[in-house]
């Protein structure tokens, strides 16, 4: 049984591969994977500055690992992966919030829950009998998992996220800077926190298919860090983050196509390497 991570070579090519742009026009499955990836990168770029400025990097990474349990549960019972994964992500966020109300810090709560959800995922995958075939794809991403339905759903989610960000832009900015002051000025901080948590959960669920559970944290953090270095306003932060995220996806996808490498890890490597020179401007 083939347990290696999938590369673009594993796609169902019907003829000889020519050039990236030629094949992008020629093969619908390649276009689907590419467009889906661009949408996912745009969504993660939109959320990333909020994650970075609110110092929610750990909860973003923890949510990605929690989603693994949801994917395993969906595989076991034959349910829709997106719905179960999203529900699991929200359950994780709720559990972290519940633990944090006691004397346990948020980071400690995440540290407790993250391995628990991962362990549950491994057990459920083992029970389902599909441990070897599905786990690598979910851990490191699998371009073959992206389909037209994913693209349509991601497009709708991205559009709604943009609309909500525009509508609640002032509330989000105040919430990011000082939650207590935002509450003092009458901003519904619980609603904003729920929206942000939902953004993170949805972004994680969509991003997992492209780069996997383990690597999702990179796309939730690196674009926001880049925007923090160069951005001067809320909109410039968001714009820079989205441009960086989509840019590294394009570069990673093109490199993976050229060298027959798994796209997810290549995208994250390029994102990290691209970020390093920018540190001198910080």
UniProtKB/Swiss-Prot annotation:
GO CC annotations on file: ATP-binding cassette (ABC) transporter complex; plasma membrane
Pfam families according to UniProt: ABC-3 (PF00950)
UniProt key word Transmembrane helix: yes
Keywords: Cell inner membrane, Cell membrane, Membrane, Transmembrane, Transmembrane helix, Transport
Topology relative to the membrane: Multi-pass membrane protein
Localization of this protein: Cell inner membrane
Transmembrane segments: 33-53, 58-78, 79-99, 109-129, 148-168, 184-204, 210-230, 234-254, 259-279
Entries under Gene3D superfamilies matching the protein: ABC transporter involved in vitamin B12 uptake, BtuC
Transport found in the keyword field: yes
One Gene Ontology term from the biological process aspect of the record: response to zinc ion
Stated role: Part of an ATP-driven transport system TM_0123/TM_0124/TM_0125 for a metal.
Record family assignment: Belongs to the ABC-3 integral membrane protein family.
Protein name per Swiss-Prot or TrEMBL: Probable metal transport system membrane protein TM_0125
Lineage: Bacteria, Thermotogati, Thermotogota, Thermotogae, Thermotogales
